[in-house]
């Protein structure tokens, strides 16, 4: 094979591999195989000076452009009318019903109304133009809707966008360039000027003349409309979406067909529920009539198509005033800042507090007391301050670190980016949180133990170590608030019962940094005893599934602490007896599979179904993804079941699950 033919073969293979990896999430080759072919292609292109216009090597952002050229779209990119209440959707639907009835009265043969519901992505709209050879010729921003700015070099850095498609028609496809949360976090870890939000990250990347900077932001995209196409027109929107998908353009998994307001309302509730679990931002839903002929007849206003509407969710980002900063002590002794905010409505809740990670983060973002700040809420966690409104800095105050621990007055020590209180003997928040963690359900499971109990043990009984729990007597507890003889006896019995525990629960209870329940189980499966784990080397630790360098270093440092070793020795001498029994994996259809259980099951609690699946060799996951093999759905299964249906994952009822066990 000559070099030109080899170049063509490599380009075809590499583009197919990219489609499998980025669009199907199902790679057929390893990264190593891909890289070898990519480097071979680079070398051949250098030797021959022959580069196909859709070669993957053209994605590399290594140019700085002089400016943006204007581009006139072949078909207008319309804005959408917006609704913020269900009543507005109902009014819009009623207008559509009336129009269809009147059109039928004039002799038009229109089908019953059917709506297609999709997510409204919060990024930057882009328009791709492919020529008659299927090659990506122009990429442009929406601009005015009629005229945009050419951003072809920038868009080519988005690896999920095919540089060549199968269509031979001149084609314009509309989509949204987005930045995922994962890409956003990774970029901000190393950026001197952190991005404030995902939308600005995407928009700023495409409007950057330095294409290398665009590539650094690792954008993604979803496509949802063919604005212009020569040849046979589409009959329905669903047919159009199928065409887009067949061209290898990335299409979101979520797309719903609804025939009633009740169905639309259900989809609004569902997407609102999963919104913060997504890896990217959406700000609502788009509801559009499916039938293209009906669309043509309904037409447009001056600004909007009448056949579609956007339902907008509550904002997940807002600006408000930073009133103060409060410093709190965690279980590890880390003293961290929390922002006290002027209350603001954000994604349906009133926000008064937000995360400020550390002083380095505060300095990078330029956050000051009294300034207006951008606050963002995602994934149902405490909101985070993303940056400041520059115009509000006048009269603001610098945030300063307390000189001593706010809880115990001890000297603070800077370790990396964080400040720590090293008073592990009498700093109340550290000790209380350590004891509460030790007693928690997934750890030693001491029933009836609360944070208030831990505070009283510290304040009135001078309990300063988890081992002190096993020295408590009934007369000690009766003197505490709300502790009568019965409650005291129950707590002592629960403490005694905790001595007989599983090894993974004991390891988790010790509070090793970055070791959760799953990691504790993985460590136990490898080392089988507390002694085995104490004596593990770094190489042995990183050899455990899902254990990386940070966790391994944390485990090694933990077991070097003399106080830790003394506490473990004392716990064992007081009768705590962690046990490890290697669970026999029962051969089954679930061995090696990823399974999610959702809803209420008749014969299993959450813990029981998890234990059962693990005994069958399954990996039990908490959320549904493309990597999920089975979803076991009980009564009142919610969004996880819906997502499984979207992704085409095998769904089992409880009866079907048990039938598979009997085979």
From Swiss-Prot:
Positions contributing to NAD(+) binding: 31-35, 79-80, 142, 176, 312
Q: Which cofactor does it need?
A: Mg(2+); Mn(2+)
Provide the GO MF annotations for this entry.
DNA binding; DNA ligase (NAD+) activity; metal ion binding
| Residues the entry annotates as binding Zn(2+) | 405, 408, 421, 427
Would the keyword Metal-binding turn up in this protein's UniProt record? yes
Listed InterPro entries: BRCT_dom (IPR001357), BRCT_dom_sf (IPR036420), DisA/LigA_HHH (IPR041663), DNA_ligase (IPR001679), DNAligase_adenylation (IPR013839), DNAligase_N (IPR013840), Hlx-hairpin-Hlx_DNA-bd_motif (IPR003583), NA-bd_OB-fold (IPR012340)
Please describe what this protein does.
DNA ligase that catalyzes the formation of phosphodiester linkages between 5'-phosphoryl and 3'-hydroxyl groups in double-stranded DNA using NAD as a coenzyme and as the energy source for the reaction. It is essential for DNA replication and repair of damaged DNA.
Checking NCBIfam families in the record gives: dnlj (TIGR00575), PRK07956.1 (NF005932)
PANTHER family, alphabetically?
CHROMOSOME TRANSMISSION FIDELITY FACTOR 18 (PTHR23389), DNA LIGASE (PTHR23389:SF9)
- What name appears for this protein in its UniProt entry? DNA ligase
- Organism per entry: Clostridium beijerinckii (strain ATCC 51743 / NCIMB 8052)
Q: Which gene encodes it?
A: ligA
